[in-house]
Amino acid sequence: MSLQLRRKTHESVVYIDRDSAPRIMPSGEDFILEDLPIGTRVLYPNPPIKGLPNREAAIRYALNHPHGCDPLFAQLEPGMRVTVAVDDISLPLPPMATPDIRQTMLEIVLDMLAGHGVDDVHIIIANSLHRKMTEWEMKRMVGSRIFNEYYPDRYYNHDAEWTEGLIKIGETRHKEPLVLNRRAAESDLLIYCNINLVPMDGGHKSVAVGLCDYESLRAHHEPQTIRDSDSYMDPARSALNHKCTELGKIVDNELNVFHIETAINNRMYKGDMDFLLKNEDDFTAFDRMKFEAMRYTMSKLPRPARRKLLHSKPAQYEMIACHAGKTEPVHERIIAKAFE
């Protein structure tokens, strides 16, 4: 098969030939332009799936039509103790433009809780052993209204090293402990608000990893699990996923968890940086001009300034699906959408 024919086998796969344009490649805080050897295979992301026109409506529908359990409103009673856990700043990357999807989910959930007389509500960031989010980051993620009402007493980071704030809920068949955030574990209802960007996000991993302690984490976040995983992004071939599933089943047996999972598209850039999503062979004169302008500007800035400039560009992710209910049926549907 000729190179000219091979390069057209899929819209996201290109084989470099004599007529191919130079390729843009990230290099630290820079972008370089290089002519690649003939025959090099270049992979591009699929075009972004169109976002849902009304994400608020999609979230409300999911809450009222859950998988494997009663609707959220039917599980609420006045005076009950509810904890809402949310993904930390590691999802998504780069950070999304505001309002964050977590803010939208929280606004809808908190209004529903208030409407059913549920006043004992805490919001916990499921940061596991990641660094704790800063006050500014926490405010940006949930918006001023929620932040001002709940921070700092009822909106805070999970602390995996605070012994009094942890409780053991079980152990695996290998006697590996599962120790979780005490507030979450002792609540009448734990609601988890999740964002799925890649297949290793969400599902059983959300609670079992996001709200655990070091001893629980060390059983699967270690070199042997990495060696035993063909790919973190293929759950069926991931030892990490298998271990998280075993822990997650303990969570589901011991706690009442209501998952809200969302899938987002891959629309990382728009406007002056949208050319970075394109095949260089399809660049217009304006695209090339934007790249040269960006490269020239970057070359004149010190490294810290380049880094700050790149990180100041929020991603333009859009929600493409939302499902709610029990862990596995919800995650199966979200993963299927993410793989599209």
Predicted stretch roles:
Residues N148-F339:
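Conserved, well-structured core segments that form the ligand-binding/active-site neighborhood
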Residues H67-D88, G115-V118, E340:
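Glycine-rich phosphate/diphosphate-binding loops that line cofactor/substrate pockets in enzymes
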Residues M1-I59:
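N-terminal amphipathic/basic leader segments beginning at the initiator methionine
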Residues A62-E77, P177-E186:
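Short amphipathic alpha-helices and their capping/turn segments at secondary-structure boundaries
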Residues L93-G117:
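Histidine-anchored nucleotide/phosphate-binding helix
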Residues G117-L129, I260:
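Short internal beta-strands
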Residues T40-P66, D88-P95, I320-E340:
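Acidic/glycine-enriched edge-of-secondary-structure segments
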Residues R81, A85-S90, N194, T262-A263:
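Short loop/turn segments at strand-loop or loop-helix junctions that form parts
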